[in-house]
Swiss-Prot record:
It is a lipid-anchor. It comes from Salmonella typhimurium (strain LT2 / SGSC1412 / ATCC 700720). Residues 1-20 form the signal peptide. InterPro entries: Ricin_B-like_lectins (IPR035992), Ricin_B_lectin (IPR000772). This is Probable lipoprotein EnvE. It is found in: Cell membrane. It comes from the Bacteria. A lipid is attached at C21 (N-palmitoyl cysteine). Pfam families: Ricin_B_lectin. A lipid is attached at C21 (S-diacylglycerol cysteine).
Amino acid sequence: MTLLSGKTTLVLCLSSILCGCTTNGLPTPYSINLSFPVITQNQINSGGYYINDAEQIRTTDGLCLDAGPDQQNRLTLRECKHVQSQLFSFHRDRITQGEKCLDAAGQGTKEGTPIILYSCTGNDNQRWLTDDNKIKGKQSRKCLGTNSIIVRKGDPVVLADCDFSRALEFTIR
């Protein structure tokens, strides 16, 4: 069995009894290639794409980053559930969900800039570092946070000064 392009190829050789093959120079055994999708534990199929190794980004307050469809790509904090809108993948300095990247809207660098999901461009406003359980924008040097000191379900996720209480601390699960 070999793994190739997200599919498993199984090569079967028919025995000499079934195909009349011999080992003394006559025709070699036949091969049949069968392809079928491989489903892994962390794989989610939705809209034709897969999220591999997807994880929740949880606050220390027990809420999760959520990019639900009713939020128009804006991230908010929601009760943690195992739903696609709360699963993110980590690729070096990018955080993605499907084909979209975590993005400081409008290439913003100021406190209060909304965090959204946006088509991946490779710009620095889509690059993130982790430091002391915080997620910090490479371009802005600001952390993911909220506009209020008291974190509540439904709060929008924005850029916040990393040294103040509006910056959120996260665990990845």
